Amino acid sequence: MKRTVAIIMTSVILLMCFSCCTQSEMPGPENPVTLTIWHVYGSQTKSPLNIAINEFNSTVGKENGITVNVVSVTSSSAIDKALAASANGEPGAEAMPDLFTAYPRVVEIVGKENLLNWDDYFTEKELSAFQTEFISEVYFDNVLLMLPIAKSTEAFYLNKTIFDRFSNDTGVSIDDLNTFAGVFETARKYYDWTDGQNFMQINDYYHYAYIGMKSYGAEFVRNSRLRLDDEVFMKIWKPLAETAIYGGICLDDGYAASRWKTVEVIANTGSTADVLYQPAEVIYPDNTTEDITAIALPYPTFVDDTFGVIYRGGGLFARNSEDELKNQAAYIFAKWLTEKEHNLDFVTDAGYLPVRTDAIETLFADFSIVEKESYHSVYQAVETMISDYTFYALPLYEGASETQLDFEQNVKAVLKTAHNQYIKRVNQGEDPETVLNELVETSLTELKKLSSE
């Protein structure tokens, strides 16, 4: 009997201890927690995610003793570098934040063992609310390390105000921008119409090549290497190179939105999230300004019967803390941010797509929930692409980030050099068509050489 009582008492004590431990590991006003975050959404002074974080801090965060502190709003590449410096213990490196937004490539930088497994906190029911493909692609060896919070795709942006004047003079139309063949022909005509101004900027040549080769049934990447020797690559390189060498495409570094502002370009391909930075007016060299209408169109196609586009979007990572309070706080914040109402408010303020199925259905059922009217054409373009296009996620492989960056820089470098040679040789009296054809070939040879180094 005494033994039985002892066992019962021991069980009660253990249960009480477990209960106390569980309570102490949950955030609350009596157990306040501060989480630091680095993210990429906007800027320090103009950020849709900062607005969402402020709302969280003043509501659910306050109720649970949680404060999310935004330490840095910067680019994904800057976050990659800062995380690498922190993970490697480099002198002067900032401490790794409790939360950060990034692309899947950071897992190899930070290390899986240092990241929180969201599966340990979200229930199966909670995860089932996410769009299936968004959640299924973010597992790493069956471990959910990256939680999707916003997704983007790509679109074609156009300064319609200036384009309309160009159209009236030349007969080109917006319908010509449905395909890359039409886009490139339009770009060359614009270069002539303006006596030497670029028509557009391509914000990601890696995406252009990936979708272009997919459209022809080929693969841009195989065994972690770019397939620049594939004959299909020449199909997509030739019209791009011809237009860039002629002068229709801006090949300088920097953001397209900045060049829109000064009318250096009037169009670009880029993320749907770029709408956050599109200017409402432009300024001319004589310092006069003009209000403009900007629109977004579906991503141009390569072939008539195959439509494809990249969809992407980083996710929310959490550092796996020894302090369980921080892990629980990270879950509470992540759950709040991905709930339908809060996620819709955040993403539609930034040109992104929500990550839950019910939120996506709500968005495309009624665009009026998007407060900024200038964003409506972005979501209309996305709606068309959801209906007609195949969406592709970029492949993950070791060194993918570096390969993508190198390809981007190499493409711009070889085409810029070729453009300068074209202008010089044509001005010296050489036949433009002969020079152009030669430079298309030599630029590809140089690109292959740089890519193999």
Question: Where are the language model's segments positioned?
Answer:
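Extracytoplasmic/periplasmic substrate-recognition and gating elements
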Residues: 248, 285-359
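Extracytoplasmic/periplasmic solute-binding protein
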Residues: 141-149, 154-156, 181-226, 233-234, ...
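Short, solvent-exposed loop/beta-turn-alpha elements that line the ligand-binding surface or hinge
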Residues: 119-130, 173-175, 218-236, 242, ...
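Conserved C-terminal helix/tail region of periplasmic/extracytoplasmic solute-binding proteins
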Residues: 383-453
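Short, polar/charged alpha-helical segment
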Residues: 43-65
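Hinge/lid segment of periplasmic solute-binding proteins
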Residues: 100-155, 184, 287, 291-300
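Extracytoplasmic "Venus flytrap"/periplasmic binding protein-like
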Residues: 62-130, 166-167, 266-267, 284-288
